[in-house]
């Protein structure tokens, strides 16, 4: 078994689209970034890559590469999944936290889970999503940005041993 942790932050910007877990969330502000700025999916990809010992998304999908400009982070997640499977890993579980002062995100959890279960080929019971505010503290509290954190447990299916890898 291997554990990976991912973290990402993007600034909020008026007129941008807010995308979390591949879901478009209506609002006046969205996240700015080189790709679609899906902070939740970025944290998830970093957690999976970290558990595999494969650096981070900046290494694999650099923002200096114009081919990633505006790309859906779900497409990048599929690429990460395609790196993971041939190496004999499967996902044990995923735990995600979104840090945002607003909007209320719980109505979107099921759609986010649907996106992730489709791409990662796992049951939705293996994915947990939660959101929290920072009680108006820091850049999240001032609504300057949104942060996300992910923890992932990978199981080495080739070894079948809890100490594998």
From Swiss-Prot:
Its cofactor is a divalent metal cation. Pfam families: YgbB. A divalent metal cation binds at residues 8, 10, 42. Coiled coil: none annotated. 4-CDP-2-C-methyl-D-erythritol 2-phosphate binds at residues 8-10, 34-35, 56-58, 61-65, 132-135, 139, 142. It catalyses: 4-CDP-2-C-methyl-D-erythritol 2-phosphate = 2-C-methyl-D-erythritol 2,4-cyclic diphosphate + CMP. The record marks 34, 133 as: Transition state stabilizer. Its EC number is 4.6.1.12. One of its GO terms (molecular function) is metal ion binding. Keywords: Isoprene biosynthesis, Lyase, Metal-binding. GO terms for biological process: isopentenyl diphosphate biosynthetic process, methylerythritol 4-phosphate pathway; terpenoid biosynthetic process. Binds 1 divalent metal cation per subunit. It comes from the Bacteria. The keyword Metal-binding applies. Pathway: Isoprenoid biosynthesis; isopentenyl diphosphate biosynthesis via DXP pathway; isopentenyl diphosphate from 1-deoxy-D-xylulose 5-phosphate: step 4/6. Homotrimer. Involved in the biosynthesis of isopentenyl diphosphate (IPP) and dimethylallyl diphosphate (DMAPP), two major building blocks of isoprenoid compounds. Catalyzes the conversion of 4-diphosphocytidyl-2-C-methyl-D-erythritol 2-phosphate (CDP-ME2P) to 2-C-methyl-D-erythritol 2,4-cyclodiphosphate (ME-CPP) with a corresponding release of cytidine 5-monophosphate (CMP). HAMAP family: IspF (MF_00107). Belongs to the IspF family. This is 2-C-methyl-D-erythritol 2,4-cyclodiphosphate synthase.
């Amino acid at each position: 078994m291997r554990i990976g942790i991912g973290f990402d932050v993007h600034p909020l910007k008026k007129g941008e689209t807010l995308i979390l877990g591949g879901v478009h969330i209506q609002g006046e502000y969205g996240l700015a970034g080189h790709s679609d700025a899906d902070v939740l999916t970025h944290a998830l990809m970093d957690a999976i890559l970290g558990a595999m010992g494969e650096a981070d998304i900046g290494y694999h999908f650099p923002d200096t590469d114009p081919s990633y400009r505006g790309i859906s982070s779900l497409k990048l997640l599929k690429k990460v999944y395609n790196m993971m499977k041939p190496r004999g890993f499967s996902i044990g579980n995923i735990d995600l936290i979104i840090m945002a002062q607003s909007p209320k995100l719980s109505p979107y959890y099921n759609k986010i889970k649907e996106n992730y279960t489709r791409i990662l080929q796992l049951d939705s019971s293996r994915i947990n999503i939660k959101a929290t505010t920072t009680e108006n503290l820091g850049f999240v509290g001032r609504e300057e940005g949104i942060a996300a954190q992910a923890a992932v447990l990978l199981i080495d299916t080739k070894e079948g041993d809890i100490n594998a890898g």
